[in-house]
């Protein structure tokens, strides 16, 4: 770990901090001219596989935005290649899996002993950690088993996840075998990122919101929990993020992740209440609000901070990744506003909007005050 005492890492551990830490999912991406300049010369996978380039775009984004953490630039699907499942990106379609996994034989052919071939990601982590030298922490990440399996089985993105759910329902033993292989690979992959200098690991479960609570508990929860438990042995806090997951929050808490990432579809304080305030939370501004005028954007960010109420364990973020056409200045201004507002003793008042089912009491603590009062993102 390169920055174990940073406000971000401490917030992940639900420890008191002077202000709310902030970073953004997909903070290095197409909305930044600097990233687009690199992409003119290199493909996405080339950037991922060349540690110096991956480190460059990671560092550039964090420094331009002035955020409190740098998330390593990589692609969610990289582990699929070392399992023997090649993929490519198609314009307008996104990732395309060349040989979808649809049978027991397909699962049997998947390899689990080649995670070391992803060493280029760990090397990029090491370069970023050395550059920041403890000034800000580095976030490593991996895809969650369900989300990776969905891509593998569907052959790419999906609206209904018919093929993935068919395997879950009709061949549960095959599903579990696939999950176990994904747990092994993602655990090894993420552990190497921590060894290389990552302070925190985020597990992205981008498509988990398509599941009922019953299906989540049966087909997903045990496998995510296995990854979380294994990675926590490294000493790194674990963030578990899923979209459209409001109904799943109590079950997601059972993974024992240190932080649960929230999307924007549920008020922060209501979500934290559903989690019984048993962990830290991250979020949860709608990414599209970054296209709004400053007055509206500021009001919505302030509302989230007020719903956090100064409770220890809130990390400000979006409810999903930054969108490609987002104005860079809005992202920079938002980061600075969160930092300055949360550092002020007067920065916590009742929420401006009344769209939450839980009440937030007026108070004036420093951000990260340990006394429970309201919810978080």
List the model feature ranges, each with a label.
Residues 92-130:
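A gly/proline- and charged-residue-enriched helix-loop-helix capping module
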Residues 117-344:
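Active-site loop segments of alpha/beta catalytic cores
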Residues 343-377:
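Intrinsic disorder/low-complexity segments
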Residues 85-99, 151-164:
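Short, flexible, mixed-charge acidic loops at enzyme active sites
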Residues 1-91, 127, 305-306, 328-343:
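N-terminal basic, low-complexity leaders that serve as flexible interaction/assembly modules and, when applicable
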Residues 76-79, 94-95, 103-105, 145-147:
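A short acidic, glycine/proline-enriched capping/turn motif at secondary-structure boundaries
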Residues 45-49, 107-118, 287-291:
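The substrate-binding groove and active-site-proximal loops of carbohydrate-active enzymes
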Residues 40-43, 103-113, 168-177:
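Short glycine/proline- and acidic residue-enriched helix-loop micro-motifs
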């Amino acid at each position: 770990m390169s920055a174990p005492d940073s406000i971000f890492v401490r917030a992940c551990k639900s420890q008191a901090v002077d202000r709310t830490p902030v970073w953004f999912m997909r903070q290095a991406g197409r909305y930044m001219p600097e990233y687009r300049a690199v992409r003119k010369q290199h493909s996405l996978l080339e950037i991922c596989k060349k540690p110096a380039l991956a480190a460059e775009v990671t560092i550039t984004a964090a420094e331009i935005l002035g955020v409190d953490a740098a998330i390593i630039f990589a692609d969610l699907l990289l582990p699929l290649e070392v399992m023997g499942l090649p993929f490519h990106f198609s314009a307008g379609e996104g990732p395309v899996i060349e040989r979808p996994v649809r049978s027991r034989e397909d699962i049997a052919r998947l390899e689990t002993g080649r995670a070391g071939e992803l060493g280029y990601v760990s090397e990029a982590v090491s370069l970023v950690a050395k550059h920041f030298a403890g000034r800000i922490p580095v976030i490593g990440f991996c895809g969650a088993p369900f989300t990776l399996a969905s891509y593998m089985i569907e052959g790419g993105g999906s609206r209904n996840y018919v093929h993935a759910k068919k395997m879950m329902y009709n061949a549960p033993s095959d599903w579990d075998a696939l999950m176990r292989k994904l747990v092994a690979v993602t655990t090894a992959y993420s552990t190497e990122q921590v060894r290389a200098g990552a302070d925190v690991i985020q597990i992205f479960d981008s498509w988990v919101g398509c599941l009922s609570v019953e299906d989540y508990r049966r087909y997903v929860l045990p496998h995510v929990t296995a990854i979380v438990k294994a990675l926590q042995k490294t000493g790194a806090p674990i963030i578990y993020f899923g979209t459209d997951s409001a109904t799943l929050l109590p079950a997601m808490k059972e993974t024992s992740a240190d932080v649960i990432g929230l999307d924007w579809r549920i008020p922060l304080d209501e979500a934290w209440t559903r989690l019984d305030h048993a962990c830290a939370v991250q979020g949860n501004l709608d990414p599209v609000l970054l296209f709004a005028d400053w007055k509206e954007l500021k009001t919505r960010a302030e509302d989230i901070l007020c719903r956090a109420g100064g409770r220890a364990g809130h990390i400000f973020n979006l409810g999903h990744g930054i969108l490609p056409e987002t104005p860079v200045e809005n992202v920079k201004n938002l980061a600075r506003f969160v930092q300055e507002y949360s550092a002020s003793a007067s920065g916590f008042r009742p929420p401006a909007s009344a769209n939450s089912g839980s009440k937030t009491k007026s108070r004036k603590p420093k951000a990260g005050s340990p006394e429970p009062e309201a919810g978080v993102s």
